[in-house]
């Protein structure tokens, strides 16, 4: 996160860190939505993933963090009214439930859709400088604004975004504050509700008039809840 500050240790209880297992390199963030399930971005997927829950400072090994592996991974493959931009979402079932603690607690799914103009909180261990990468040991947090989708469409002509989309657009139009590389998969929390997943942005982050794109959690609720409930057939939303 660019232009943010170190997160308060109590405001990131649901934030998880995804690593590539063999190289032990940090990949992405993710969000614990209950004891056994994590929501992140599909583009964070690797063949072998390690998930740390309850981490704050990545450089310090301490006994409060819990290590898990994906038992199952689910990708959103609905075609009707969804474009490729709307599908950057991955649901991971952990190999065993985590134990909640002082620094580990889930973030509940949203009860209503996000409202343009909302102030949203972002957080992650992504780079704090751009275009040079500087990865911090601790997660950084910042506030950005939920913008109209059309702003992102105009800002990123190279993406050729569709005229309408289920993707969220958020940032600070003056520049200086933004999610960036390796914040992917982490949460966008608007008015206290988990509304988005860090997806894509400009190569150089935090530029003026270049807000970033976030997968919209609310439009995937049925899919998420069906999978968690163990439903064999997952109906695509209309």
From Swiss-Prot:
UniProt keyword list: Blood coagulation cascade activating toxin, Disulfide bond, Glycoprotein, Hemostasis impairing toxin, Hydrolase, Protease, Secreted, Serine protease, Toxin
InterPro entries (alphabetical): Peptidase_S1_PA, Peptidase_S1_PA_chymotrypsin, Peptidase_S1A, Trypsin_dom, TRYPSIN_HIS
Note, other: Negative results: does not have phospholipase activity, does not aggregate platelet, and does not affect the release of the neurotransmitters dopamine and acetylcholine in the nervous system.
GO cellular component: extracellular region; secretory granule
Group of enzyme by EC: hydrolase
Subcellular location: Secreted
Single GO MF annotation: serine-type endopeptidase activity
Name the record gives this protein: Thrombin-like enzyme gyroxin B2.1
Domain Peptidase S1, first and last residues per copy: 1-229
Disulfide bonds: 7-141, 28-44, 78-236, 120-190, 152-169, 180-205
Entry-listed glycosylation sites: 81
Subunit-level organization: Monomer.
Pfam families the UniProt entry points to: Trypsin
GO biological process, one term: proteolysis
Tissue specificity: Expressed by the venom gland.
Family in the record: Belongs to the peptidase S1 family. Snake venom subfamily.
Major localization listed first in the record, in broad terms: secreted
E.C. numbers: 3.4.21.-
Active site: 43 (charge relay system), 88 (charge relay system), 184 (charge relay system)
Species, as recorded: Crotalus durissus terrificus
Entry function: Thrombin-like snake venom serine protease. Displays a specificity similar to trypsin. Releases only fibrinopeptide A in the conversion of fibrinogen (FGA) to fibrin. Shows coagulant, esterase and amidase activities. Reversibly increases the permeability of the blood brain barrier (BBB) in mice. Induces the barrel rotation syndrome in mice, which is manifested by gyroxin-like, rapid rolling motions. This syndrome may be due to its effect on BBB permeability, and certainly also to other actions affecting endogenous substrates present in the endothelium, nervous tissues or blood.
């Amino acid at each position: 996160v660019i232009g943010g500050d170190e997160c308060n240790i109590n405001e990131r209880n649901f934030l998880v860190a995804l690593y590539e297992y063999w190289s032990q390199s940090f990949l992405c963030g993710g969000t614990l939505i209950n004891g056994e399930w994590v929501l992140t971005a599909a583009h964070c997927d690797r063949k072998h993933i390690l998930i740390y829950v309850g981490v704050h400072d990545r450089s310090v090994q301490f006994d409060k963090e819990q290590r898990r592996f994906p038992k199952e991974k689910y990708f959103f493959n609905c075609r009707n009214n969804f474009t490729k931009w709307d599908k950057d979402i991955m649901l991971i079932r952990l190999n065993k439930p985590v134990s909640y603690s002082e620094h580990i607690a889930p973030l509940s799914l949203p009860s209503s859709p996000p409202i343009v103009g909302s102030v949203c909180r972002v957080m992650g261990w992504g780079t704090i400088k751009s275009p040079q990468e500087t990865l911090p040991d601790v997660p950084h947090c910042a506030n950005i604004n939920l913008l109209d989708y059309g702003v992102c469409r105009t800002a990123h002509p190279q993406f050729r975004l569709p005229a309408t989309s289920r993707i969220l657009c958020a940032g600070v139009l003056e520049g200086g504050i933004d999610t960036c590389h390796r914040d992917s998969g982490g949460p966008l929390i608007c008015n206290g509700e988990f509304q988005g997943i860090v997806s894509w942005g400009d190569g150089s982050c935090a530029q003026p008039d270049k807000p970033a794109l976030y997968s919209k959690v609310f439009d995937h609720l049925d899919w998420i809840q069906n999978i968690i409930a163990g439903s064999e057939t997952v109906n695509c939303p209309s």
